[in-house]
Regions:
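Short solvent-exposed beta->alpha transition segments
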Residues: 23-31, 38-89
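Exposed beta-sheet edge and beta->alpha loop/turn motif
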Residues: 83-133
Length: 133
């Protein structure tokens, strides 16, 4: 009985931290999307993790990658935050995003916590069938 009580206690102690993390994660993604909306790729690049920054080297290469590989995040329409789940290096935030043509896309943002802030360490385009009812 004690192990179950201990696990329950850990869950309830972690829940408030998780809730705050969820808000911070969503704020980070929202700020990056706002920067894309304003064509401020230097600012958008600042929300990427150091590993992503080292891959692209700077905002210009990052801009090219976003426009070619993830056009739906550049000047998006409506954005809806879906589930956020832990994964082995941090958290994964699923979102629904509409592009300029009003087509829905589903993305998973992989987030890592560095110090007291969250950074985007990757984005995966998900099949829409993963979210059908």
């Amino acid at each position: 009985m004690r192990p179950i009580s201990f696990i329950c206690a850990l869950f309830f102690l972690a829940a408030p931290i998780f809730a705050g993390d969820k808000e911070d994660i969503q704020a980070t993604i929202s700020r990056q999307l706002k920067a894309f909306q304003l064509d401020d790729f230097a600012k958008a690049f600042s929300y990427a993790s150091p590993s992503i920054q080292s891959i692209f080297g700077g905002p210009d290469n990052f801009e090219s990658m976003v426009k070619r590989g993830y056009p739906m995040v550049w000047k998006p329409g409506k954005v809806t935050f879906l589930s956020v789940d832990p994964y082995h290096h941090g958290m994964a935030q699923n979102i629904q995003i509409f592009d300029r043509n009003k087509k829905a896309h589903y993305l998973r943002y992989y987030m890592v916590k560095l110090g007291d802030s969250w950074k985007i360490s990757g984005v995966e385009i998900l099949p829409s069938s993963d979210f059908s009812v």
